[in-house]
């Protein structure tokens, strides 16, 4: 009788489970790119993945569990862009400009990711949580320096975050070209209260990132 390698059998089982879970999450991501989260069913996810409902329920208790898994991946992907290496930008307004440009440019480079983030950033509180806090911190610092309009930080946050998310959606739908990215960022900075000259200077300090590159020196 052949000897059974229980350790290897266990490894194979874990690898198979990991692949099945990844298939389900990827299927959900593809559906979520064009559909509201609440409209997707278990049947559609399993059909998209080519798996049975039994396979689904061996990995997730239900759709809420699946949403959470997708959200966790989105948050990780968002932070990967946010934490991309590059030269640091000391100026808080320059950091805002660099971060805005990086996320929009990444949505142009990877439209599926951009579309999913554009949806998930509003639907899942955990997505972009760290980037949200960094943006607010940079807004507070810039306002303390007297460089922004006298608006609340929450209003400033909604302005920046809302425009960036919409621009990411437009970029993922090929309605925004790389040449449009600086104009979007300049519009955000002007809306925050910077003069045209100050906004151009911040864009320059943000470096190549704000001219359409896909990696951020320091995220918003």
Describe the role of every protein-language-model region.
Residues 1-35, 39-51, 65-68:
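Basic, helix-initiating cap at the start of DNA-binding domains
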Residues 1-8, 137-144, 173-220:
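C-terminal peripheral helix-coil segments that are non-catalytic and often amphipathic
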Residues 41, 114-118, 151, 197-202:
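Short, hydrophobic secondary-structure boundary micro-motifs
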Residues 50-60:
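Short hydrophobic/aromatic patch on the recognition helix
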Residues 60, 65-74, 117:
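Alpha-helical DNA-contacting segments of helix-turn-helix folds
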Residues 69, 76, 80-112, 123, ...:
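Hydrophobic alpha-helical connector segments
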Residues 79, 98, 120-169, 186:
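Amphipathic alpha-helical packing segments from all-alpha helical-bundle domains
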């Amino acid at each position: 009788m052949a000897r059974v390698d229980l350790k290897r059998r266990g490894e194979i089982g874990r690898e198979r489970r990991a692949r099945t879970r990844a298939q389900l999450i990827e299927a959900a991501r593809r559906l979520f790119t064009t559909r509201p989260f609440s409209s997707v069913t278990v049947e559609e996810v399993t059909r998209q993945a080519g798996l049975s409902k039994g396979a689904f329920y061996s990995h997730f208790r239900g759709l809420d569990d699946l949403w959470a898994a997708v959200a966790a991946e989105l948050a990780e992907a968002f932070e990967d862009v946010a934490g991309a290496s590059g030269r640091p930008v000391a100026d808080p307004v320059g950091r805002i400009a660099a971060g805005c440009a990086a996320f929009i440019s990444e949505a142009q480079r990877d439209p599926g990711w951009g579309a999913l983030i554009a949806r998930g950033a509003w639907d899942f509180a955990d997505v972009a949580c760290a980037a949200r806090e960094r943006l607010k911190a940079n807004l507070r610092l810039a306002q303390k320096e007297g460089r922004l309009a006298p608006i609340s930080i929450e209003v400033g946050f909604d302005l920046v975050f809302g425009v960036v998310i919409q621009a990411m959606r437009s970029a993922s739908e090929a309605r925004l070209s790389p040449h449009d990215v600086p104009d979007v960022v300049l519009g955000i900075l002007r809306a925050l209260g910077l003069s045209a000259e100050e906004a151009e200077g911040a864009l320059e300090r943000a470096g190549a990132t704000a001219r359409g590159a896909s990696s951020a020196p320091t995220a918003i």
